[in-house]
């Protein structure tokens, strides 16, 4: 793992997989916060809905309604550009060089410890088909890796 080039005002573990360069989207809840969009940062989760409700993400091209949703679907409908703009703004807000959040007395309210959170399925999946459940597909895949006579493994 390469060291992070961006510095955050949030204390991050040295070996974190979630520095400012890698902010993955997800959905989380806590006992006092219902399911909402969040982004991992170190061993924390950034509460995106709370940031949006406080007016920090207004210029990113994603509506506050979409960011308040309990799933990522509405946000993702905005395309890569919207997600990229949000990620760039989160990098700016949580950068050590940006005073916008870090100088606020309530700055820690925008963060939740991952260990105290429950993660949820991040999107509503509308129409998934498992093609491998078809015997024909299983046979065709089996022939790619085994002798055609042994394409299906019978247990």
Specify the residue positions occupied by each region the protein language model found.
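Glycine-rich, N-terminal phosphate-binding loop and its surrounding beta-alpha-beta segment
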Residues: 58-120
